[in-house]
């Protein structure tokens, strides 16, 4: 025993001396060469050892990427105080330090060996470790260093900010152990824990692994055994009594560039207990290293290529502090990019999932709580390893670049909302719409126009229907848009027509609403815009009591259900029975027709009202029947029987016109050809094609040189809104408009042309603008070559007497027939009796054109007289017909139908005569025109923004160019619309402004195109009787400019009978035939070209094929 004791004391003395020498060194005995030699180490070696500690592999004797094993050795030593301490030493080669990790795949900014690792961590302070009676073990509870990216490091150098201000440091009270603790017990515990886990891991990764991490130690002396027993007792007490101080204090930061090799690190805010999850929810850390290896999904960071099998710490957001226990208990894995890419198995083995090895590699003893946490983590890691599929490392996921972006704290920014295209909000931006929160309390519907009394305006914003109000925003010419708010409590009736072609709602309100609207919209009779809600005008009260909203399209079932439910709720709220009613298409169409006629009939003089009183019931019904046919918005047959067809099938190109090598060819497809079916709207391709066809095929060379036709897209592009551009901020709105189309006229000077044609499309409706004589600065009068003064005076007196006598005889002979009386009365009340020009009476009989015209008029009058009275004599009817025909021609301004000595005949007269003689249907149409025509209807509803309107009381000589010695050519803009509706003054204004800028660009000087210089007018032109032929009428307007040219441009202008309406019934088929014929011709040309240049077949065979193709 004595010898044993002496031997033990001698060993203790030797051990204490070696420990004293070790403590005297700068690194406190922790160096790269673990031995008890007396060699000194440099400060640089100490720095490198600190770096090596961070990359120590946890498996004992595990192979590195270079095939070398790590030597690990455990010893029990005693300090000068007589305490026995367990130390574990691991030697790591310097070549495996972080020097080789520069430019690693995860984008981390690793430091070289000449820099301390603490300079690149988030906190420069390291844990002070465990102190055993004055002996400080530096790496007992070392915080896992979180390495920052290069971007964060550069930011820290600029801002000196590493933590958010609310993150505070948690100080740790070191654990002090009493002397003579049971070291052997700690060894035994550690060996048992590793022997339970490592065999399972060895089976999983199928690699040879040692059952124990520690090498066998020599037998301990009895004194050492006694110390181990004491340590075991202390360990049980520590599990219950030892607690760590979690008091927080201000965060102490040191400069990231001040630490030197011998400088001691300070405490960090992460303890052993917090790291292993005992107090996870209270850990005030802002960066958590999460290495959940359950799925082995390897993500790229900072755009670097990831190595398969490399473990990347996940830097989470500040909101993710409260992490579950399982996340923090995941194994912590550190690896470098010098691992072999092809040796995945060795890499898996070298990166141990056991945190126990990492703990045991520290020279400080483990407490009971730490040991329990290690065992728990080891078991969980083993279960996760079992669930990993064998090929999981091959299945890598690559995130987009934007998803990999990080903010200044290393947090992901993929939650940043993406910039989306601007869409119209379903709720209005003002406070009124905020009251409509429920989808069944409000609905937003697209409406095309509104009519209040005789006021007609287009809408620029969708209409909002709510339980409390209806919000309408309409366009006001030359002013800012007007917003109307109708309180639903003031409504008394709502009638709804929801058919596909005419979705319209009729609202009725109390008189105060109409008065408010009259003031807000500035409605007055001087401007011929008013509403008569109080019944002052008995004839128009019914039509003017509505507030009419015409929708853009028919409502789908869900929208219709919401709309009707809102209207019903309004009726219940107002306590009005039968508040909401549905009306059929016929009634809705009739009301719209009546509203259109209301304006025209209202502006008539008292003469027109007296004339209405004289009309009989039969004649009145005939007028109403024709009015319905003329002004009906839609054909009833089309609504009830014919539906729009939808083009189905592949789109094939039919023709290119003009064909190559000509420039500016327009491609026409079979889908475009489908637009020529009855009831379909013409598209821009057909419009542009036919206008170009007219110029190139039908017009004479001199006529084509006098005109310029813009594309149907010109006005849309001119008036198109664009995003703000810094280059155009200083330009006016007129210059911005012109800039969009400035290249359209780079090869043409439009001011050298006589006519500029601009097809326009607004609200799915085609109409035509004609800029006449843009180069003239003032009206120009020229002698009328067809004017003969003597013939006019002589013929006027002769025809006037004959008209009076014949009319008187007709009065006597037809006095017994009440149905004919209105017609005769109407003729006697005319202001003028128009003369028929004829210098040579003998030429009347010899001229076949005169005979042909008289025959057609006789045919038309026969039908009139037959309708008026079957007993009327034929000669009297002939006299009446001559008078009516003469008057009709004079009032309508048909220059070509005057029978002058110059024998002037143009295209319109030929067309009219042909249609009159070909069918009885054309005669019936002429009959309707003759009966219903009245001088008071001249130039009705002509409107313009400059006030140059048609006069109601204009004489019948207006438009009679052949009765005046001069003809007028003046700059003007004519708007030809086949559906007489709103004033297009804004269109005229925009075209004027374009001409001003274009003149300045082309001529280099400024010129005014104001309303005094360039007048605007809406001439009365033939009107369509359906809702789909507007494009066809636009094409005919252009064609009639050359078939029946306008010689005098005095305003106002009446072109109501410019061309016969029956022609429009065959216009679509005419255009279709032109396209098909061009297709056939171009197909033959292609075949001819192919056969001519074919070298595969012999010459004779090729010629035969060409002949056959021509015959086909």
Curated annotation (Swiss-Prot):
What result follows from mutating residue 1030 to S?
Answer: Abolishes enzymatic activity
Q: Which organism is it from?
A: Homo sapiens (Human)
Q: Which residues form a coiled coil?
A: none
Q: Where are the residues of the annotated region Protease?
A: 666-1112
Gene it is expressed from: SENP6
According to the UniProt entry, which residues carry Phosphoserine?
42, 335-336, 350, 352, 919, 1111
Q: What is this protein called?
A: Sentrin-specific protease 6
Citing just one GO molecular function, the answer is:
SUMO-specific endopeptidase activity
Instruction: Indicate, by first and last residue, each region the UniProt record lists as having compositional bias (Polar residues).
Output: 891-902
């Amino acid at each position: 025993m004595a010898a044993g004791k002496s031997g033990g004391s001698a060993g203790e003395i030797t051990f204490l001396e070696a420990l004293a020498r070790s403590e005297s060194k700068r690194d406190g005995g922790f160096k790269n060469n673990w031995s008890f030699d007396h060699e000194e180490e440099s400060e640089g070696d100490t720095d490198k050892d600190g770096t090596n500690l961070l990359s120590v592999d946890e498996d004992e004797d595990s192979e590195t990427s270079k095939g070398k094993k790590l030597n690990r050795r455990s010893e029990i030593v005693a300090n000068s105080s007589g305490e026995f301490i367990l130390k574990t030493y691991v030697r790591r080669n310097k070549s495996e330090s972080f020097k080789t990790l520069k430019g690693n795949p995860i984008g981390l900014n690793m430091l070289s060996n000449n820099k301390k690792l603490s300079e690149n961590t988030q906190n420069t302070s390291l844990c002070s470790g465990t102190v055993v009676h004055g002996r400080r073990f530096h790496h007992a509870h070392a915080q896992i260093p979180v390495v920052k990216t290069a971007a964060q490091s550069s930011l820290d150098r600029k801002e000196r900010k590493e933590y958010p201000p609310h993150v505070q440091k948690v100080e740790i009270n070191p654990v002090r152990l009493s002397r003579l603790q049971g070291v052997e017990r700690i060894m035994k515990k550690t060996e048992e824990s590793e022997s339970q886990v490592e065999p399972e891991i060895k089976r999983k990764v199928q690699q040879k692994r040692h059952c124990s991490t520690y090498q066998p130690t020599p037998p301990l002396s009895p004194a050492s055994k006694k110390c181990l027993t004491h340590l075991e007792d202390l360990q049980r007490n520590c599990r219950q009594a030892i607690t760590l101080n979690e008091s927080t204090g201000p965060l102490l930061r040191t400069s990231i560039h001040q630490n030197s090799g011998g400088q001691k690190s300070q405490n960090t805010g992460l303890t052993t207990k917090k790291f292993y999850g005992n107090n996870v929810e209270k850990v005030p850390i802002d960066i958590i290293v999460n290495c959940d290896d359950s799925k082995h999904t390897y993500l790229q960071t900072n755009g670097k290529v990831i190595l398969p099998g490399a473990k990347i710490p996940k830097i989470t957001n500040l909101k993710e502090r409260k992490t579950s226990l399982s996340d923090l208990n995941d194994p912590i894995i550190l690896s470098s990019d010098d691992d072999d890419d092809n040796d995945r198995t060795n890499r898996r083995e070298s990166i141990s999932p056991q945190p126990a090895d990492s703990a045991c590699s520290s020279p400080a003893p483990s407490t009971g709580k730490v040991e329990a946490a290690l065992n728990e983590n080891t078991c969980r890691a083993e279960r996760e390893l079992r669930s990993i599929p064998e090929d999981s490392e091959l299945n890598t996921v690559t995130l987009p670049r934007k998803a990999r972006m990080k903010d200044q704290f290393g947090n992901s920014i993929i939650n940043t909302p993406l910039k989306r295209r601007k869409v119209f909000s379903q709720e209005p931006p003002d406070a009124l719409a905020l009251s409509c929160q429920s989808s069944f309390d409000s609905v937003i519907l697209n409406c095309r126009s509104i009519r209040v009394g005789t006021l007609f305006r287009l809408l620029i914003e969708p209409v909002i229907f709510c339980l409390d109000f209806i919000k309408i925003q309409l366009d006001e010419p030359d002013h800012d848009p007007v917003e109307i708010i109708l309180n639903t409590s003031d409504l008394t009736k709502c009638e709804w027509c929801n058919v596909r072609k005419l979705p319209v709602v009729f609202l009725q309100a109390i008189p105060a609403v109409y008065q408010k609207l009259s003031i807000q919209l500035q409605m007055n009779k001087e401007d011929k815009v008013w509403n008569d809600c109080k019944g002052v005008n008995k004839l128009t009260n019914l039509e003017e009591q509505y507030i009419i909203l015409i929708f853009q399209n028919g409502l789908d079932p869900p929208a219709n259900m919401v709309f009707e439910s809102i209207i019903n709720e309004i009726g219940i709220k107002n306590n009005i029975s039968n508040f909401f009613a549905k009306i059929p298409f016929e009634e809705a169409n009739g009301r719209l027709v009546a509203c259109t006629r209301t304006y025209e009939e209202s502006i008539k003089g008292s003469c027109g009202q007296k004339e209405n009183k004289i009309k009989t019931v039969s004649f009145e019904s005939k007028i109403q029947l024709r009015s319905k046919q003329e002004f009906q918005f839609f054909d009833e047959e089309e609504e009830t029987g014919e539906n729009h067809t939808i083009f189905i099938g592949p789109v094939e190109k039919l023709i290119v016109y003009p064909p190559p090598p000509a420039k500016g060819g327009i491609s026409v497809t079979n889908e475009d050809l489908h637009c020529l079916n009855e009831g379909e709207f013409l598209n821009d391709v057909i419009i542009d094609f036919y206008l170009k066809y007219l110029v190139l095929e039908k017009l004479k060379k001199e006529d084509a040189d006098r005109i310029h036709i813009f594309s149907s897209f010109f006005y849309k592009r001119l008036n198109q809104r664009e995003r703000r551009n810094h280059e155009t901020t200083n330009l006016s709105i007129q210059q911005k408009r012109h800039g969009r189309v400035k290249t359209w006229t780079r090869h043409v000077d439009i001011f050298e042309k006589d006519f500029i044609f601009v097809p326009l499309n607004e609200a799915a409706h085609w109409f035509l603008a004609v800029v006449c004589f843009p180069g003239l600065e003032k009206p120009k009068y020229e002698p009328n070559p067809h004017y003969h003064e003597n013939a006019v005076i002589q013929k006027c007196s002769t025809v006037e007497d004959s008209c009076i006598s014949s009319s008187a005889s007709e009065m006597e002979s037809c006095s017994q027939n009440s149905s004919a009386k209105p017609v005769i009365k109407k003729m006697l009340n005319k202001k003028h009796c128009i003369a028929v020009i004829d210098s040579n009476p003998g030429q009347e009989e010899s001229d076949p054109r005169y005979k042909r015209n008289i025959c057609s008029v006789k045919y038309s009058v026969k039908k009139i007289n037959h309708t008026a009275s079957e007993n009327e004599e034929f000669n009297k009817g002939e006299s009446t017909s001559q008078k009516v025909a003469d008057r009709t021609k004079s009032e309508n301004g048909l220059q070509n139908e005057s029978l002058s000595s110059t024998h002037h005949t143009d295209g319109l007269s030929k067309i009219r005569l042909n249609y009159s003689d070909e069918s009885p249907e054309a005669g019936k149409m002429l009959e309707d025109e003759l009966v219903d025509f009245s001088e008071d209807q001249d130039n009705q509803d002509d409107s313009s923004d400059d006030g140059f309107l048609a006069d109601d009381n204009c004489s019948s000589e207006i438009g009679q160019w052949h009765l005046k010695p001069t003809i007028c050519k003046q700059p003007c803009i004519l708007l030809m619309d086949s559906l007489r509706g709103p004033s297009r003054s804004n269109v005229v204004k925009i075209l004027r402004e374009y001409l001003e800028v274009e003149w300045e660009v082309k001529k280099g000087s400024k010129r005014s195109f104001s309303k005094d210089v360039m007048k605007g007018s809406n001439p009365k032109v033939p009107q369509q009787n359906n809702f789909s032929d507007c494009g066809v009428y636009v094409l005919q307007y252009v064609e009639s400019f050359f078939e029946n040219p306008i010689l005098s441009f005095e305003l106002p202008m009446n072109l109501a009978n410019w061309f016969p309406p029956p022609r429009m019934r065959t216009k679509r088929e005419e255009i279709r035939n032109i396209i098909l014929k061009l297709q056939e011709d171009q197909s033959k040309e292609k075949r001819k070209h192919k056969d001519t240049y074919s070298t595969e077949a012999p010459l004779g065979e090729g010629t035969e094929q060409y002949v056959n193709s021509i015959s086909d």
